[in-house]
Amino acid sequence: MSEEGSPMYSPFFGVMGAASAMVFSALGAAYGTAKSGVGISAMSVMRPELIMKCIIPVVMAGIIAIYGLVVAVLIAGKLDEAPTYTLYQGFVHMGAGLSVGLSGLAAGFAIGIVGDAGVRGTAQQPRLYVGMILILIFAEVLGLYGLIVAIFLYTKTSS
């Protein structure tokens, strides 16, 4: 055991924060991409000219993984060995990773479901496209909220 505020297991929590940021965000992005991709594939049989217009849900789902990557890289850059890496830093980094990771997971699920239904509906009624985009923006913002909170938490360990 090292100092009181810095036990030897304190970096474990930072590593778990970085891992959870990337893993959960990637899971959300993968689900959103897969679910939207299935909808685009089904829609393109009837209306192949709409493929490029309806690729937006897949792009938005991919952005969710970038949020997790940014936070994971930030946390990994601050990781250090136990005497210099405190338990406080480990817990804050874990909170930041869970914040962006779980919000990315939720956003990816929302983007996938909305994207799937939206592109299928757009194939039948093109006026639904604008509504789908608006709903996708609101789903994407869920992941952005997690990124903002994670960066805010991350900055608390800088001083």
From Swiss-Prot:
Q: Is Cell inner membrane a UniProt keyword of this protein?
A: no
Q: Where is the signal peptide?
A: none
Q: Which Gene3D superfamilies match?
A: lithium bound rotor ring of v- atpase
Give residue numbers for the site Essential for proton translocation. Answer: E140
Q: Kindly state which keywords UniProt assigns to this record, in alphabetical order.
A: Hydrogen ion transport, Ion transport, Membrane, Transmembrane, Transmembrane helix, Transport, Vacuole
Q: A single Gene Ontology molecular function, please?
A: proton-transporting ATPase activity, rotational mechanism
Sequence ranges on the Cytoplasmic membrane side: 33-54, 115-132
List residues in topological domain: Lumenal. Answer: 1-11, 76-93, 154-159
Membrane topology of the entry? Multi-pass membrane protein
Which Gene Ontology cellular component annotation is one that this UniProt entry carries?
proton-transporting V-type ATPase, V0 domain
Which Pfam families does the UniProt record give? Answer: ATP-synt_C (PF00137)
Q: Is the keyword Transport in the record?
A: yes
The portions of this protein that span the membrane are 12-32, 55-75, 94-114, 133-153
Its main localization is membrane
Give the superkingdom in one word: Eukaryota
What compartments host this protein? Vacuole membrane
What NCBIfam families does the database record attribute to this sequence? V_ATP_synt_C
Subunit composition and interactions: V-ATPase is a heteromultimeric enzyme made up of two complexes: the ATP-hydrolytic V1 complex and the proton translocation V0 complex. The V1 complex consists of three catalytic AB heterodimers that form a heterohexamer, three peripheral stalks each consisting of EG heterodimers, one central rotor including subunits D and F, and the regulatory subunits C and H. The proton translocation complex V0 consists of the proton transport subunit a, a ring of proteolipid subunits c9c'', rotary subunit d, subunits e and f, and two accessory subunits.
What does this protein's UniProt record list under function? Proton-conducting pore forming subunit of the V0 complex of vacuolar(H+)-ATPase (V-ATPase), a multisubunit enzyme composed of a peripheral complex (V1) that hydrolyzes ATP and a membrane integral complex (V0) that translocates protons. V-ATPase is responsible for acidifying and maintaining the pH of intracellular compartments and in some cell types, is targeted to the plasma membrane, where it is responsible for acidifying the extracellular environment.
> What family does the database annotate?
Belongs to the V-ATPase proteolipid subunit family.
Q: What is this protein called?
A: V-type proton ATPase 16 kDa proteolipid subunit c
